[in-house]
Structures are given as structure tokens and as C-alpha cells.
UniProtKB/Swiss-Prot annotation:
One of its GO terms (biological process) is DNA-templated transcription. GO terms for cellular component: chloroplast; DNA-directed RNA polymerase complex; mitochondrion. Its EC number is 2.7.7.6. Its main location: plastid. DNA-dependent RNA polymerase catalyzes the transcription of DNA into RNA using the four ribonucleoside triphosphates as substrates. InterPro entries: DNA-dir_RNA_pol_bsu_ext_1_sf (IPR042107), DNA-dir_RNA_pol_su2 (IPR015712), DNA-dir_RNAP_su2_dom (IPR007120), DNA-dir_RNAP_su2_hyb_sf (IPR037033), RNA_pol_bsu_bac (IPR010243), RNA_pol_bsu_CS (IPR007121), RNA_pol_Rpb2_2 (IPR007642), RNA_pol_Rpb2_2_sf (IPR037034). Keywords: Chloroplast, DNA-directed RNA polymerase, Nucleotidyltransferase, Plastid, Transcription, Transferase. In plastids the minimal PEP RNA polymerase catalytic core is composed of four subunits: alpha, beta, beta', and beta''. When a (nuclear-encoded) sigma factor is associated with the core the holoenzyme is formed, which can initiate transcription. It comes from Vitis vinifera. This is DNA-directed RNA polymerase subunit beta. GO terms for molecular function: DNA binding; DNA-directed RNA polymerase activity; ribonucleoside binding. It is found in: Plastid, Chloroplast. The gene is rpoB. It is an enzyme of class 2 (transferase).
Length: 1070
């Protein structure tokens, strides 16, 4: 965070700064640290030694540009070169060469990496910090049991527990535990050293009997006892070197390696003074931990809160990339060791370049970015989605929690999250509370802790100092809860203010305050900070809003919001979507695909993005905002991107809305809209779909791309050029051929149809032996072809197939079934599109654009939408834009309502429209029914809120099935639109059909249309010939499956005919 020109003022840090700092830390420190760990490698005879000279490593500038990497599905990476030496010990000769170790994917200006043509981002992980934690639990008798858990750097745990007799045990597995004396002795301490280093030696001596003395008589006997308990081995194992190695690998490496963060935490918690470079668990640590545990037993000491952020650490992009580089170097070490031995065996002279291969590093990073749970494909629905994705924090992933086992307490908001993790923005569903979002001012500290900035209040000095505090430090300060804006520090402060101290919220005098917040949005994430009047909303609805803003579709004509929060500009700029001038100069030339800027003696050509597809099929497009000959300054907006206007985020539209019921068409969150939104292209968006096909070399020969497909009709091939690829700019419909392809196949006489054999026999015509495998346009894909790419990779073998990609643009107007939402969690589905003349209209004759249900407000408690609605109306009439800071009630009571009413009153005066503000019902107005012209009985709230169109569109959801695939086991239709699946008729649906008495429809759904194999085959013949469908005589497949499953449980199910006369069972089986 940077200090401004005025003392005490600050700017919001870049939203991608955490990603940039993490990657720079990996390049500057992480690479060097891991290269220094690379050992010297010797051959078996110890004649040759290989080593790396870490002081001189270099990363080469990539050969390709970012755009080309995306275009050709390549990785945007840098080659890593290191000096290596090969030393012959007998002659003391050394051969030094610069070797190529591998490719390391680079980070671009968006904070993402391009791997195989895809934008990928690494999100931050929250893990339990290594160290020791004390807690107590009640046993079945209601007695407190105290335990101390040592968490290693790898996530392994070693538990110390104390029983009723004050004996201390170390739990080595779920069932097995050993005495603390045995563990200390196995780690190298004798009894005298143990008793000298503890505060309560009499307690240790109290449970030292003869049997225990024998176990700790020597280090070897202690190790044997430890191994016997740990590995659950019976008999009398013999001490050996291999036994020690196994114990070291399986226990000590996983549970006793603390790392530098763990060493620092244990030193602080146990008041030790062990050097920081000693990152392994020592006997002194175990004994000091036992002392503290005894103190806990007798009421001395404080238990740890495991969910406090001071007990968590952030595993950032730097740590994850460094771990992968270390793993790659271990693999490289094994390769070099094997290559040296092979060269000596075959009497070859090795060189450093011959010994090293780039495969381990390159493949490790490719598999990490492709398969690791914390490496995700960048969500590029809109600019907000891009920057929010990189600021996520996750408890999930390797070494973390899982969605099914995480408790409610871990998911809940903790006081230490204040200013660090947003209390609102989290995912919905099973991962709620486990995936959060960092607050806008939060940063990752040196020790992996989340830090938040505060202003220090000092009586001695008038200067305001800004501090970044970790969660462990700000507990000791009285923190005022943001009682004033950072810009208004000169105003007289109130005498009594709300404050936070040691996780409690208090009300104290201003003189006692140590720190105060620096910004009203300090506690929120970017998504929550874009919600105006957020303090008037229920937190659940604010959560939905911050998630739904990320689902907004960029519209063809974007529009700035009338009511905003002030963060829209920075959110747009940090997303990298608008083009910004890097230096001042003059515009020489501009058109749709580039801007040429002249300045500082250079001429710079800036390319613009033209109809680029995002991974959510939305359209990314840039439009120049400067004219030729205009002089510009550094930082000025040159071009707007998708969903930005004038360098500000613009996700939706300001539309005229009325809150009223209308013939039941807006019940249950349905929305009624005017046809003006369709014909005026208000909510029209462009979507780009990608279709691709590959050509392979088969065993019968290579596949061919051609426009001569004998199997198909001519009108399906009308859009193909001479090469067999669809012509750029052509309009294509469902079923049209995009790429013509023929696959050769084996020609057998028996495989020909009878007419083909006749043609061959009579006329000697050679029938085609190729099968058409063309790329056809699927259902719902109609549109305009805007781009065709034929990617030919080097080599041309079957392992490097040629790829042809066709991009088709669709123009989608808003329609019935689409989802729209406001910024307060008020979402709904379009239920009906009314003609303009039928919509309710205002007193000045304007018809409203949307009609929302007023019952959706009081029960959801998202009243912020009413404030935004009314203020938007005033802003639309006065041609003003408002930027509202949250929690303005701290300045005066009812501040938000006063602001809205004053602006409505001013709009009423300036426009001479008294209906805008009527004192009897302020904020409401009488409106008229468009069908009859009569006024409605009650006054209605009307306004101009900001409404978004979401990515959940009916064109992507609508689906029908006449016939399709069936599951192999149950013989029932598959599930899902992608598999052409059917609609599920469950238990409650059956009840509903039974309630209406539709027996035949119910029978069809459970037999013909589902899993009765014979009956569904007969239906086809009956519909062709005519007549009635025969009733099924035997059971459907799912019933037969149930019978088979019962048989597998040794339960036989038989059925018999029962006589109607005497109800006796006829033993003849039916």
C-alpha cells in the first residue's frame, strides 16, 4: 500500500498484487532455495561428482507472445538455465557447462499463467500453521482431558496427552501410545537430561517403575520399544540400521519436521530459544511441551483457539510453485544418478549436458497446473470474475480439509477474520465457509500470515502512522471500528466509540483507542464492496449478490451504474480489460483492431482484442475510445473492454422498475419485462462457441479434410470451401457441416450393402471405402462463423494431430426463461414479455421496463434494493451518478433515507414533476394500468436499480429427449443434458400423478418410457403400423435388478398364482 501526498492518506492496493508478489518471491527466493538443496551426486565408485552452481542461473525471455500461446495451445514459459560441473576426482579435472533444466510457466499481467493455451490461476490455501496447540475435551465421565498437538510442516500430527495419574503419553497411532520418556530417549536424551530439562521432575519420576527404566536404559532399547508400538510388531525385534531408517521415514520425517514457521511458533508458545535454522523437533521441544501440558492440567496456561487466524498460515502461489520445483529436482536427481551409473557401466564419457534432461521440471509443472486442485482454469465470464478468482482462499486441497468432513465451527466467521477474510463472500453449497475471499486491503506477510492495515492513534505525535498487523498482534490493541472516513481525519471525534479488543466488541472512550480502520470497505472483498447500501441487507442476500455479480454476462451496449460504491473504476482497471496508456503521447492512427501511439520518440502499436471467446463462451471485445490526433496522458483510457464504460465496471443496465403484483406473472420471484428490452437490444449479449475436430493417422491411412463427402446431401455442404472447411462469415444452422472429414476403413465384401455389391458386380463401380466423420453443428448452435483456425503442430505424426477450430458467434436477446438479478440478492426468471402499451406507465407517460414482486423484499430483508431503486430514479432525472460508502448511519441516524429523500425532492423540483416526491407516501407514486388506463389502487415504488443479466440462460438449459442412451445396469435413460438424458420421475412425482388418477400415463412413465426393454421396442412398431400399445406382461428391468440384488443377499423372491375361489396358493409357479 502506498502513501499519498497528504499525510495519512492511502490508496487501495492492486487487486492482483498478492499473485504478483507471490510469483516474484518464487523467482527471487524459492528457485534459489531449492537449487541450493540439490545434492552433489557421485557414482557408485565415487570417481565422478556432479553438482550445480546455483549462483549463476538465468531465465530466458519466452520465444512466443502470450496471444500466440493461447492461439496455438502452447505454454507461455521461460527456459531455466543453470551452470553445472562434472568433477573427476582421480585427475581433479572439472568440466563446466550451462545446462537447460526445464520450462517454468510465467505469470502474465493478469496474475495468471497460460498452460496449453488455457489461462490458469493458482489460488491461496489456508492450512493449520505448524506448531503446538493445547486443547481440552470432556471424556465419557465428564472429566476434562488435556492434549497438546504438534503439527508438522507436512501436516502430520503428534499428540501428547495426560491421564488422571498425571502420566504423559505420546500417541503414535490411533490405537497405540507410548510414554513420553520412551519418546525422549528414542530421540537421544538420557534420564538425567530429561529430569534436568523439565519443571516438574517429581511427576516424571512418579511413574518410572522398573519396567519403564528397562525400556529407556539405552537409546537402542528405547527405539526398539518405540518401533514395536508404532509398527504394532510382536515378538522381540532386533535393533538395526534399516529399522532406524524405516522409523525415520515413516514417523519422524512426517510428524517432526517443523519448518521455519513451525520453529518460530513453537519457540514463541513454549518460551524457547532454539535457533531458527533448527527446523526439526528436538527432545527439548517435547519436554517443554510436556511441562506446559502439566501446567494446563493444574489450571495454568491458556488453551488455543484452533480457528484463530494466528494459528493458520497461507500457502500462496510462491509456496506451491516452490514445492513443485523441489519435487521436480528430486526426480531430476534420480535421473542424473541413474544416467551416471549407466554411462560408467557402458564406459562412456558423460558431460553435464548429457546427464540432465528437462523432462522432470517441465512435466511436473504441466501436471501441477493441469491436475492440482488449487490450480484452476481462470473464470472469465466478466472482468469482475477475473480479479475475484485470484483473491480466493481455500481450506480445501492437499493437506487441508474436505467439504464433507469440515465442521460448522471451521466454516463460521471468526473475529480474527476482521479486515483479512470477507465475512460475506463465500461459495454456496457444500463448500460454504471453506472457500472465502480476501478483504481488499489484506496482504500475505513474510511468515505466511494474513495482515491488515490500521492507523495508529498517537497523542505525542500528530502524524498518522499506518501499520500492517498480523492476527496475533492486533489482539493487544483497542481497535476503533472505523468511526470516520480516512479523508476526514480533522473532524472532532465522538467521545464514546465502538471498538474491538481481544475478540470482544466493546464501547470505550476515544482516548483509550490505539488503532482505527483506514477504509469503510476494509472488512469486505471486492464483490461485497460493489454492493451499495450493503448495511441495509441481510448477510445471506449480500452473499448471493457478491456471487451473482460474477455471473453477469457482458452486454453488447454496456452502461455505468447510477448508484455505485466507488470501487468500480479500480475493479475494471486491475482486471486488465480496458487498454491504458503506458506513457503520454499523441494518437497517430486508430481503427477496430489497433491503436498507434506516438510519444517519447517511439511509435507504439497497441493491438485490441476482437471478438475473443472466454472460457464461459462470453464475448471479450475492445472498442477504441480515443480519436486520431488527440493528445493523451499516462494512465488515460484508450479503449474500453467487455463490461466496462469509461474505465469503470459496467455489468448491467439501469432500467425503470415497479414493485407491484401483475396478474400473478411475477409470483415466486418471477419477473415481468417490457418488449422494449428485446427490440431495443437493452439486454442483448454476444456468445461465442468453439467447435473443434482433429485429424488422426489410422491403421488404414490418414484421415482427409475434404468438401467431397459422397454420403451427405449437397445443401448440408453449401458452406464449405474447396478445402472442406466452413467459409468465414457464413451463417450456419443446426446439422450443417463445419468441417468435412473422411476416415478410411477396411473394405470387406461382406460389409457392403446388397445394392453396393450389385453395382460392383454389374458396372464395376468402386464403392467408397471411407466413413464420413464430419464436424456437424449441434442443436442450439446456429450463428455466424467469425473465425476458423487450422493448427498444424510440428511433427505431423498421429501423436501430434492437426486441429481445426471453428468459432461461431450468437446474438442472444433476453427471452422468457433467462435469469436476471439485482445487486442485493434479488434474482428472478423472466416469466412473460409484455407489449409496451400493456406495461404499467408513470404519470409522465413512460412505461416501466420490469415489474418485480414486492413480497420478495420484507421476508428476504434486503432493503438496500429499495434505497438503490429510489436514488437511481433521482439520479436518472438529475443526470447524476452517486458513489455511496457503506455504514453511513455512523455519521447520523437514518442517513441513507435522508440522502434518498433529499435527492428525490431535488429531482421533483428541478424537473417540475411533483409525482417524483409526494410527502404523503415518499418514494412511491401512483401509476396507471397500460391495458385500461385506470390508476392502480395503491401507490407503487418505482425507480431505476441496476439489473444484471446472468449467464444462466434458457438457450443453454432447455432440453428434450425422444430417444437416447440407456444405463447398462438399470436400463433407464441417462441423466443430464450433455448425455441426451431423460427427466427423472421420482417418488414424489409418482404421488402427484397418482393424486390426479392418471394411471395410464403413470404406467407409461414407469415402463415404456423407462426400463421395460421389450415393451419400449414394441412401442416403435405399434406407432408405425397403428393400433393400441400392448400392456407389458413381465416386470421392468429395475424390478429384476432388485430381485438380483436380493439374491446376492441370499434372499430368493418367487411369485405364485393365487386361486380366486378359495385363496389357496397354487404351487405351480407362474
Amino acid at each position: 500500500m502506498f502513501r499519498g501526498g497528504n499525510e495519512g492518506m492511502s490508496t487501495i492496493p492492486g487487486f492482483n498484487q498478492i499473485q504478483f508478489e507471490g510469483f516474484c518471491r518464487f523467482i527471487d527466493q524459492g528457485l534459489t532455495e531449492e537449487l541450493y538443496k540439490f545434492p552433489k551426486i557421485e557414482d557408485t565408485d565415487q570417481e565422478i561428482e556432479f553438482q550445480l552452481f546455483v549462483e549463476t542461473y538465468q531465465l530466458v525471455e519466452p520465444l512466443i507472445k502470450e496471444r500466440d500461446a493461447v492461439y496455438e495451445s502452447l505454454t507461455y514459459s521461460s527456459e531455466l538455465y543453470v551452470s553445472a560441473g562434472l568433477i573427476w576426482k582421480t585427475s581433479r579435472d572439472m568440466q563446466e557447462q550451462t545446462i537447460f533444466i526445464g520450462n517454468i510457466p510465467l505469470m502474465n499481467s493478469l496474475g495468471t499463467s497460460i498452460v496449453n493455451g488455457l489461462y490458469r490461476i493458482v489460488i491461496n490455501q489456508i492450512l493449520q500453521s505448524p506448531g503446538i496447540y493445547y486443547r481440552s475435551e470432556l471424556d465419557h465421565n465428564g472429566i476434562s482431558v488435556y492434549t497438546g498437538t504438534i503439527v508438522s510442516d507436512w501436516g502430520g500430527r503428534l499428540e501428547l496427552e495426560i491421564d488422571r495419574k498425571a502420566r504423559i503419553w505420546a500417541r503414535v497411532s490411533r490405537k497405540q501410545k507410548i510414554s513420553i520418556l520412551v519418546l525422549s530417549s528414542a530421540m537421544g536424551s538420557n534420564l538425567r537430561e530429561i529430569l534436568e530439562n523439565v519443571c516438574y521432575p517429581e511427576i516424571f519420576l512418579s511413574f518410572l517403575n522398573d519396567k519403564e527404566k528397562k525400556k529407556i536404559g539405552s537409546k537402542e532399547s528405547a527405539i526398539l520399544e518405540f518401533y514395536q508400538q508404532f509398527a504394532c510388531v510382536g515378538g522381540d525385534p532386533v535393533f538395526s540400521e534399516s529399522l532406524c531408517k524405516e522409523l525415520q521415514k515413516k514417523f519422524f520425517q512426517q510428524r517432526c519436521e517443523l519448518g521455519r514457521i513451525g520453529r518460530r511458533n513453537i519457540n514463541r508458545r513454549l518460551n524457547l530459544d532454539i535457533p531458527q535454522n533448527n527446523t526439526f523437533l528436538l527432545p527439548q521441544d517435547i519436554l517443554a511441551a510436556a511441562d506446559h501440558l502439566i501446567g494446563m492440567k493444574f489450571g495454568m496456561g491458556i488453551l488455543d483457539d484452533m480457528n484463530h487466524l494466528k494459528n493458520k498460515r497461507i500457502r500462496s502461489v510462491a509456496d506451491l510453485l516452490q514445492d513443485q520445483f523441489g519435487l521436480a529436482l528430486i526426480r531430476l536427481e534420480n535421473v542424473v544418478r541413474g544416467t551416471i551409473c549407466g554411462a560408467i557401466r557402458h564406459k562412456l564419457i558423460p558431460t553435464p549436458q548429457n546427464l540432465v534432461t528437462s523432462t522432470p521440471v517441465t512435466t511436473t509443472y504441466e501436471s501441477f497446473f493441469g491436475l492440482h486442485p488449487l490450480s484452476q482454469v481462470l473464470d472469465r465470464t466478466n472482468p469482475l470474475t477475473q480479479i475475484v478468482h485470484g483473491r480466493k482462499s481455500s481450506y480445501l486441497g492437499p493437506g487441508g480439509l474436505t467439504g464433507r468432513t469440515a465442521s460448522f465451527r471451521i466454516r463460521d466467521i471468526h473475529p480474527s477474520h476482521y479486515g483479512r477474510i470477507c465475512p460475506i463472500d463465500t461459495s454456496e453449497g457444500i463448500n460454504v465457509g471453506l472457500i472465502g475471499s480476501l478483504a481488499i486491503h489484506a496482504r500475505i506477510g513474510h511468515w505466511g500470515s494474513l495482515e491488515s492495515p490500521f492507523y495508529e492513534i498517537s497523542e505525542r505525535s500528530k502524524k498518522v502512522r499506518m501499520l500492517y498487523l498480523s492476527p496475533s498482534r492486533d489482539e493487544y490493541y483497542m481497535v476503533a471500528a472505523g468511526n470516520s472516513l480516512a479523508l476526514n481525519q480533522g473532524i472532532q471525534e465522538e467521545q464514546v466509540v465502538p471498538a474491538r479488543y481481544r475478540q470482544e466488541f466493546l464501547t470505550i472512550a476515544w482516548e483509550q483507542v490505539h488503532l482505527r480502520s483506514i477504509f469503510p470497505f476494509q472488512y469486505f472483498s471486492i464483490g461485497a464492496s460493489l454492493i451499495p447500501f450493503i448495511e441495509h441487507n441481510d448477510a445471506n442476500r449480500a452473499l448471493m449478490s457478491s456471487n451473482m455479480q460474477r455471473q453477469a454476462v457482458p452486454l453488447s451496449r454496456s452502461e455505468k451504474c447510477i448508484v455505485g460504491t466507488g470501487l468500480e473504476r479500480q475493479a475494471a482497471l486491475d482486471s486488465g480489460v480496458p487498454v491504458i496508456a503506458e506513457h503520454e503521447g499523441k494518437i497517430v492512427y486508430t481503427d477496430t483492431d489497433k491503436i498507434i501511439l506516438s510519444g517519447n520518440g517511439d511509435t507504439l502499436s497497441i493491438p485490441l482484442v476482437m471478438y475473443q471467446r472466454s472460457n464461459k463462451n462470453t464475448c471479450m471485445h475492445q472498442k477504441a475510445q480515443v480519436r486520431r490526433g488527440k493528445c493523451i496522458k499516462k494512465g488515460q483510457i484508450l479503449a474500453d473492454g467487455a463490461a466496462t464504460v469509461g474505465g469503470e465496471l459496467a455489468l448491467g443496465k439501469n432500467v425503470l422498475v415497479a414493485y407491484m403484483p401483475w396478474e400473478g406473472y411475477n409470483s415466486e420471484d418471477a419477473v415481468l419485462i417490457s418488449e422494449r428490452l428485446v427490440y431495443g437490444d437493452i439486454y442483448t449479449s454476444f456468445h461465442i462457441r468453439k467447435y473443434e475436430i482433429q485429424t488422426h493417422v489410422t491403421s488404414q491411412g490418414p484421415e482427409r479434410i475434404t468438401n467431397k463427402i459422397p454420403h451427405l446431401e449437397a445443401h448440408l455442404l453449401r458452406n464449405l470451401d474447396k478445402n472442406g472447411i466452413v467459409i468465414l462469415g457464413s451463417w450456419v444452422e443446426t446439422g450443417d457441416i463445419l468441417v468435412g472429414k473422411l476416415t478410411p476403413q477396411m473394405a470387406k465384401e461382406s460389409s457392403y450393402a446388397p445394392e453396393d455389391r450389385l453395382l460392383r458386380a454389374i458396372l464395376g463401380i468402386q464403392v467408397s471405402t471411407s466413413k464420413e466423420t464430419c464436424l456437424k453443428l449441434p442443436i442450439g448452435g446456429r450463428g455466424r462463423v467469425i473465425d476458423v483456425r487450422w493448427i498444424q503442430k510440428k511433427g505431423g505424426s498421429s501423436y501430434n494431430p492437426e486441429t481445426i477450430r471453428v468459432y461461431i458467434s450468437q446474438k442472444r436477446e433476453i427471452k422468457v426463461g433467462d435469469k436476471v438479478a439485482g445487486r442485493h440478492g434479488n434474482k428472478g426468471i423472466i416469466s412473460k414479455i409484455l407489449p409496451r402499451q400493456d406495461m404499467p406507465y408513470l404519470q409522465d407517460g413512460r412505461p416501466v421496463d420490469m415489474v418485480f414482486n414486492p413480497l420478495g423484499v420484507p421476508s428476504r430483508m434486503n432493503v438496500g434494493q429499495i434505497f438503490e431503486c429510489s436514488l437511481g430514479l433521482a439520479g436518472g432525472l438529475l443526470d447524476r451518478h452517486y458513489r455511496i460508502a457503506p455504514f453511513d448511519e455512523k455519521y447520523e441516524q437514518e442517513a441513507s433515507r435522508k440522502l434518498v429523500f433529499s435527492e428525490l425532492y431535488e429531482a421533483s423540483k428541478q424537473t417540475a414533476n411533483p409525482w417524483v416526491f409526494e410527502p404523503e407516501y415518499p418514494g412511491k407514486s401512483r401509476i396507471f394500468d397500460g391495458r385500461t388506463g385506470d390508476p392502480f389502487e395503491q401507490p407503487v415504488i418505482i425507480g431505476k436499480p441496476y439489473i444484471l443479466k446472468l449467464i444462466h440462460q434458457v438457450d443453454d438449459k432447455i432440453h428434450g429427449r425422444s430417444s437416447g442412451h440407456y444405463a447398462l445396469v438399470t436400463q433407464q435413460p441417462l441423466r443430464g443434458r450433455a448425455k441426451q438424458g431423460g427427466q427423472r420421475v421420482g417418488e414424489m412425482e409418482v404421488w402427484a400423478l397418482e393424486g390426479f388418477g392418471v394411471a395410464h400415463i403413470l404406467q407409461e412413465m414407469l415402463t415404456y418410457k423407462s426400463d421395460h426393454i421389450r415393451a419400449r421396442q414394441e412401442v416403435l412398431g405399434t406407432t408405425i403400423i397403428g393400433g393400441t400399445i400392448p400392456n407389458p406382461e413381465d416386470a421392468p428391468e429395475s424390478f429384476r435388478l432388485l430381485v438380483r440384488e436380493l439374491r446376492s443377499l441370499a434372499l430368493e423372491l418367487n411369485h405364485f398364482l393365487v386361486s380366486e375361489k378359495n385363496f389357496q396358493i397354487n404351487r405351480k409357479e407362474a
